[in-house]
Structures are given as C-alpha cells and as structure tokens.
Amino acid sequence: MKFAFFTLGCKVNLFETQALSQLAQARGHEIVDKDADAVIVNTCTVTSVSDHKNIRAFHKLRRDNPNAVIAACGCFAQTDPERVRATGEIDLICGTRDRAQVIDLCEQAVSGQAVQVHESEDSGFETLPAGIPHGRTRALLKIEDGCNNFCTYCIIPYARGRVRSLPVEQALGQTARLADAGVHEIVLTGIEIASYGKDFEPQVPLTELLEKLLTAQPNVQFRLGSLDPRAVDDVFCERLAGFANLARHFHLSLQSGCDTVLRRMNRHYTSEEFYRCVERLRRAFPDCSVTTDLIVGFPGETEDEFTQTLAFLERCAFASVHVFPYSVREGTKAAAMPGQLDQQTKTARAERAKQVAKTLSAAYRKQFVGRTLYALPEHPTGGLWAAHGRYGFPVYIEDKAEKNHPVTVKVIGLHKDGVLAKFEN
C-alpha cells in the first residue's frame, strides 16, 4: 500500500506523524507524496483559524487523492468529529487516542473490509517510535502529552486530555536508539513538558528525567520544547547548569506581561515571578537564549495593559518573541468574555509588539559577533549553509559544510533571523 501523511500544527503533531510513518514503513508500506491508497491527516485545533486550515486541507487532499481512504486524527478530529464528518471528505476519524490503530484501520478500509473505529479510553501515555525523519538532522521525542492547566483561551486540554508521561526507562531507550542512529540533537517535546512525571506515583520531576538523559548521552545535544516558567526553579538550574549538552535555549510561555491580563487568562504566575525565572536562567546559563510567546488583544486588554506588556518584553530582553493576535476559540471561557477587541486593534498591537521583538532579537544576537559557536549544518540556502546552534537562532555558514556533521564557526555578523558565520582559518 501507498501511504501519504499531512501534518498541521505543533511539534507534537509532527512527532506523531513521523511515528505513524515509521509504523507504516515497518509493515512494508511505501510513503508517497501523491497517488496514495491512504492519506492520514494529523489535525490541529489551537485556534479557529486552525480549524479552517484543516477543512481546506481535507478538500485539497481529496482533490489530489480522489480514490484514497482519508483518515483524520489529532486535536480537531478529537474535539469536533461532527464538523470533520460534515465536510464529506474524510473516511475515518480517530482523534488523539491510540494513534497506532489508524494504520490498521486504513489497511482494512483499503482492502474493502468493514471498519469500526473504537473510542479508546485515556489509559496512559501512548509510546510511539522515535526516529530521525528523512532529510532532517534533528529528532523529536515526545515525553509528555495532555495538559491540566486550563488557560481560559485554550481548547487543548479538552483535545489532549490530562497529563500523561513517557516512562523514564523508555525515554532512555529511545534516546539511545536515536544516538546509535547518528542523531546529534534531540528536541524533547510535549503539550506541557513542565508537567512531566506528575502522573507517576511517586512523581518524577522533569529535572530528574533530564539529568538521566543528559548523563546517558553526553555526545547528544538536548533541546527543550516550550516550558511553563514555574518549571524553572532553583533545583532545575542548579542540577542542570553543569551539562554542556543541554542547549542554551529556553522557551518560556509568557502570553502577557500584565498581571491583570494573566489572571484573566488563568495563567498561574505573575509577571514578577516570570521575571525571576528569566533571571534565574541567566545566572545559571550565561548568555542563554530566552524566547517566548505573546498573545495581544486578549479580551478586555486596555491600551495601558498592552503598554505594560511592551515594557515587560524590554525588561526581559527576550532573544525572540512569537507574537499572536488573540483569536476567539469557541468552547473556551475567553470566547464568552466581555471586551472582545476588533481585529484592527489586535493587528495593530501585534505589529507594535513585533517591532519591539525585532529590536530585542538583534540586540541579543549582536553579542555573539566575533565569538566561536557550535553549529549543526542542516541544508544549503541562498549560497550559505543553514545550521542549528546551541542558542536557538539559526547559524548561516559562508563556507561549504557537510550535513549533520557538527562544526565550530566564528560569527562575523547578523543575517536574517540568525547570525552569519565562517570557518576559522
């Protein structure tokens, strides 16, 4: 059989799609880009815009694969299966539980068998194979799924369920296999990785897992996905600062720099508590890259509250800020809040925040000019080699490099969203 895969959304979805692709290949199936017998769409529902992207993807995939069995899994399929079904394009709907069954179901449907999709109970973490995807230099490893935080703007806890974690021994085994396969960098991802191990009895803190992984694979660089700032306590910093193979890039989810907005969002920290986490990281990991996400135009956000957020961005001196204008997500508390802002105001505030973020990013990267950095080349682009470094920003190398072979380069300037570098003579 020929399988095709299409992914929307986050790194967790990307990992899960890669895992399903590996499962299909292990059964002898061919992975193709077109003329597939079965197409698996991994959907996203983080915003209403995401839902529309899913539906457009369904229609396009059906046009491109008129005779294929098309299966939808993921968050949109989990939260709104009736809407998925109403498109008339999808043959199988599987949601976010028991992902591996979707391969079985596609095989049955293509062979003409009657298919019954069983709604799986939330029975724990579903372990899927980790592997380096074709054409990439880094591997993703999902260590956690689900979220217990219930921010007022977010539908994901309803799509993904409660926190579930990959057992430590399985994490060690998967990273060992990736290292043996020649992977130089592993990105640890999940829906809310700061909650890793809270479902275990006794609980296993994220810090403990990281210590074991970093110790077991000293020649592999580990990078963390998005972190709730509450994970960055003194223990986290004291126990991990000595590991050279932990990337000096920490993405802390902020969302707003104004305390009144944070309370409306049901974020469980204040701006001052967040700032102390940033300072803690910089003391433990000098020159580390601290990046963040920001939602502007949240319901009820005043000009003064927005101005407080801009000032807080500058105070934290983030290396990069992903700015999003608030998008109404039906089914969340925020969607019913008073004080919904018009799109023009939200767009204007997003542009102002992006300008601040652009200035901060350039200021952070300038400090590396003249310094020597580690880089992992990934692909050629525009006469340069694009590479990943330890600090979160891209490294563009002037000289010819070899993919997936770590190098040491000297930074000679800024380039696009990263730095320009060359081999030292």
Describe these PLM feature segments:
Residues 336-425:
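Terminal RNA-binding accessory module
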Residues 1-196, 235, 246, 250, ...:
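Proteins enriched for Cys/Gly/acidic motifs involved in redox and nucleic-acid/cofactor modification
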Residues 40, 75, 102, 188, ...:
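Residue-level signal for inorganic ion chemistry
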Residues 262-265, 333-337:
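Short acidic, glycine/proline-rich loop/turn micro-motifs
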Residues 190, 226, 254-256, 292-296, ...:
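Active-site proximal loops enriched in glycine and acidic residues that flank catalytic Cys/His/Asp
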Residues 134-137, 147-149, 246, 256, ...:
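Short flexible coil/turn linkers enriched for glycine and charged/polar residues
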Residues 70-71, 79, 180-303, 314:
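Conserved SAM/AdoMet-binding glycine-rich loop
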Residues 100, 149, 161, 194, ...:
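Glycine-centered loop/turn positions within well-structured domains
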